[in-house]
Amino acid sequence: MNFLDESFWLAVSFIIFVYLIYRPAKKAILNSLDAKILEVQEKVLKAEKLKEDAALLFEQTNAQIQKLETLRSQMIEESNEVTKKIIQEKTKEIEEFLEHKKSDAIQLIQNQKSTATKELQDEFCDEVIKLVSEYFQSAKFSESNIAKNLMDKSDSSHNNDKST
């Protein structure tokens, strides 16, 4: 290899040229890479923070869901109890109403029964009085007829005795 050869000096010049260009470019490249690294690190930190926030939000949401489930269960239980209580009250009211209606119906039946009994007794008494009155009138008539007949018979027999 000859040091005076053009190819050699061309190669050396090229290496020096590359070195001179690389040196300032190295700083720019390193600065650019450092900036990219910082940017990526910031994005990673933001992503981790978002992940933590999402996990916290998920936990809070789950806690709220649990509270709402508990509240829903309590509300359902309370509404069932209130419903049962209302049903019991209304059932009791209906039973009292029916009992009252039953006693009213029994009282009405007894009143109608006593009224009907009194009417029948009054009709019976009126009929008996009428029959007794008719009997007495017919008996008076009969008595007067009997007395007349007896008198007539006694007169006839008395007249027959006299004739004989």
Swiss-Prot record:
State the source organism's domain of life: Bacteria
Disulfide-bonded cysteines: none
Which family is annotated?
Belongs to the ATPase B chain family.
Provide the protein name.
ATP synthase subunit b
In its UniProt record, a GO molecular function of this protein is: proton-transporting ATP synthase activity, rotational mechanism
| Transmembrane portions of the chain | 7-25
Instruction: Report keywords, A-Z.
Output: ATP synthesis, Cell inner membrane, Cell membrane, CF(0), Hydrogen ion transport, Ion transport, Membrane, Transmembrane, Transmembrane helix, Transport
Please tell me the species this chain comes from. Answer: Rickettsia felis (strain ATCC VR-1525 / URRWXCal2) (Rickettsia azadi)
This chain's function reads: F(1)F(0) ATP synthase produces ATP from ADP in the presence of a proton or sodium gradient. F-type ATPases consist of two structural domains, F(1) containing the extramembraneous catalytic core and F(0) containing the membrane proton channel, linked together by a central stalk and a peripheral stalk. During catalysis, ATP synthesis in the catalytic domain of F(1) is coupled via a rotary mechanism of the central stalk subunits to proton translocation.
The record describes its membrane topology as: Single-pass membrane protein
| GO cellular component terms given for this protein | plasma membrane; proton-transporting ATP synthase complex
Localisation per UniProt entry = Cell inner membrane
List, alphabetically, the HAMAP family matched. ATP_synth_b_bprime
Subunit structure, per the record? F-type ATPases have 2 components, F(1) - the catalytic core - and F(0) - the membrane proton channel. F(1) has five subunits: alpha(3), beta(3), gamma(1), delta(1), epsilon(1). F(0) has three main subunits: a(1), b(2) and c(10-14). The alpha and beta chains form an alternating ring which encloses part of the gamma chain. F(1) is attached to F(0) by a central stalk formed by the gamma and epsilon chains, while a peripheral stalk is formed by the delta and b chains.
In terms of Pfam families, this protein maps to:
ATP-synt_B
Q: Which CDD domains match?
A: ATP-synt_Fo_b
